[in-house]
Amino acid sequence: MLPTLPNIAGRINTMATFLLPVAIGTIILLFLYGKYVTSTLIPGPPTLPLIGNLHQLPSDDRRHVLAQWHKKHGPIISLKFGWSSVVILGNIAVTKELFGKRSLKYGSRPRMVMARDCMTKQMQTSTLPWGEKWKIHNRIQLSLVGGPKIRSYQSLLDIESCKVLYQLLSTESLVTCFNRFKFNIIYTLAYGKDPDQNESDFHEILELADHFTQTLTNATWVVDLFPILNCLPRRLAPWKAVGDDFHRRAMGWFRRNSEAAVKSNSWNWTKHVQFNEDTGNLSVSEMQYLIGVLFEAGVDSTATVLHFFVLACTLYPDAVTKARQELDKVVGSARLPTPKDLPQLPYVKAFIQEVLRWRPITAEGLPHFTLEDDKYQGYDIPKGSTVIFNYWSGHMDEDTYQHADQFCPERWIERPDLPLGVFGYGRRACAGRRLALMSLETLIPKLLWAFDFRSPAGTDHGKSRDPGTEHQGALIKPRSFPVSWHPVSNDRRLIIERLFQERDKDLDTVLDDIGKAFERY
């Protein structure tokens, strides 16, 4: 992803060498030592003129190359792409310090020509620089997916998680079940519409989200390396047509659903934002966009985490046994687990944390941009620097996580202070992290309680092997692996079927109850 991230050229401090009279040489050297001893350039691999380090990074999977550079040069390295310098952070403690504690300095974004200017017309929240517009976007999104009000969504999460369990009784496609889980939640909340009655919207938004990430990660857009080229006329700038086509399609989807949501009888995010939130000087199109992009951020990422959960179940059956024993002791076999049980389920909670750490779903995060000069561990990080967190290296760091390549929920019980940086830090941390975690903590305990996930009989004697991972757009996903699943018992199958039939099918009533609870918080 790195070469496609638009960057702003970093300023590099250099020391000039002067011919000095011998008589005062010692005095000047001492002066320079006192001034510069703590001012050191960030290390990194050697570069070539014009292209920098582009030739050293593979186009598909950069994790191993970056890991080698971090091992050689340390947790903070500097790379060059075209005219732009990029600082890469490969350690969670360093990232937490800079992006978290020093968030005022690191809380902006560099210019992202293809992503921000061409494809989203400066309406995609995650690409906006620090300023009043981003503050409004972030405040509204946090009010919907990040604050205490998300507790009001629990009834909908229970309905959708039970729906996943019921579908798994008969389907052969984990992909569809997991993709629909988060889509159904956000679609229902955003627009007050029944997702089961709008199948085409599901496929269209997945296609748009995939197109956005594929466009950004499968090609090195020259305009991101040399932003001045965006001044060229359209006939000499083919990326402009690509961006315009994407924006037209995305805006059409957002507008169509938003206009229907305003006319809906039930409570939904769109109506709440339009009539209850202070939207400043945002246009109607921008309000529609900032709600719509919540799909891009949440649907595919949650599904990917769930796929890694299933992979962990097939590779580490002993961990599944421990989790299920805990569930049987606390919950029993007569009902499904709920989030209220989690305080009494430390191993199950640790299982979820370890899934998130063991296989981060993205290699590198979106770039941060420094608003002030900074100095860290003797390194100068000038104002206008692009700084990126290497999620994969950070969560595979042996200094932080012993035997980091192993799936080990026990580590979170033995060391509850371990950091988990998958949602980022500071101002630019994932706005929907609380809803994402709430969704996983609702569904995964139910999956552990209800199903056995195993390698099919006859597949390497029933033993599963790690298939490895692959990049699909901006996400890291498991390569295809054989898996079969069946209910833990027939009694649990019957409970799933009964709860599915008894679920509240009146969506307007569900949403109105959510709306009343939402407004009370």
UniProtKB/Swiss-Prot annotation:
Q: How does the protein's chain sit in the membrane according to the entry? A: Single-pass membrane protein
Q: What Pfam families does UniProt report for this protein, alphabetically? A: p450
Q: What is its EC number?
A: 1.-.-.-
State the needed cofactors, names only: heme
Q: Write out the pathway annotation from the protein's UniProt entry.
A: Secondary metabolite biosynthesis; terpenoid biosynthesis
Kindly report the protein's main subcellular placement as a broad class: membrane
Q: Name one GO biological process term.
A: terpenoid biosynthetic process
The Swiss-Prot or TrEMBL record annotates one GO molecular function as: monooxygenase activity
**PROSITE patterns in UniProt:** CYTOCHROME_P450
* Keywords assigned: Glycoprotein, Heme, Iron, Membrane, Metal-binding, Monooxygenase, Oxidoreductase, Transmembrane, Transmembrane helix
Q: Where does heme bind?
A: 430
A single cellular component GO annotation: membrane
Similarity comment: family membership? Belongs to the cytochrome P450 family.
* Protein's UniProt name: Cytochrome P450 monooxygenase astF
Task: State the organism's lineage.
Answer: Eukaryota, Fungi, Dikarya, Ascomycota, Pezizomycotina
Q: Which gene encodes it?
A: astF
